[in-house]
From Swiss-Prot:
Represses a number of genes involved in the response to DNA damage (SOS response), including recA and lexA. In the presence of single-stranded DNA, RecA interacts with LexA causing an autocatalytic cleavage which disrupts the DNA-binding part of LexA, leading to derepression of the SOS regulon and eventually DNA repair. It comes from Shewanella sp. (strain ANA-3). The lineage of its organism: Bacteria, Pseudomonadati, Pseudomonadota, Gammaproteobacteria, Alteromonadales. It catalyses: Hydrolysis of Ala-|-Gly bond in repressor LexA. GO terms for molecular function: DNA binding; serine-type endopeptidase activity. It comes from the Bacteria. Pfam families: LexA_DNA_bind (PF01726), Peptidase_S24 (PF00717). Its EC number is 3.4.21.88. This is LexA repressor. The keyword DNA repair applies. Transmembrane segments: none annotated.
Amino acid sequence: MRPLTPRQAEILELIKRNIAETGMPPTRAEIATRLGFKSANAAEEHLKALAKKGCIEIMPGTSRGIRLPVEEEDNSESGLPLIGQVAAGEPILAQEHVEQYYQVDPSMFHPAANFLLRVRGDSMKNIGILEGDLLAVHKVQQARNGQVVVARVDDDVTVKRFEKKGNLVYLHAENEDYSPIKVDLSFQSLTIEGLAVGVIRNGDWL
């Protein structure tokens, strides 16, 4: 990878930090505001330069269409495990759920990722989490309102934005075609499996 200018390194760190804190990349306008650019167009030029250097991928058609690329080196049992279908009642990292391992440095995400989860469906497409993507997940058991989480609701695993109000939890999609999932903790089971800390495109080359 070609060396980055100080400004490019600053933007790349901002992208990683925003994903760690909110579960999604920043918009061009947010980058411009935080780093003092006069316009979102200035941020766009820096993003294009980062994309040319292989540091990010830009997905057209969405304001948050920024992804962190990665390449698979082999399928040995090292690196980050890719979780496929999750059986009811089983821990998400149970060996039988692991499809393969990717040679991904967990520290490229902030906080560090513990596993990858294959995205199914388009309920989070408005923040750039698309069908077939690999979602980098930092394993935790608790979440704050507004964070994008991997949650298990009565043994169904889903990726949604978390909101808790008293004894009720709402899991919000980022797609207007989907209604929130309402969970009443007084009689329903909900487990936080982790926080979304990054998205990797699941292309044929990966």
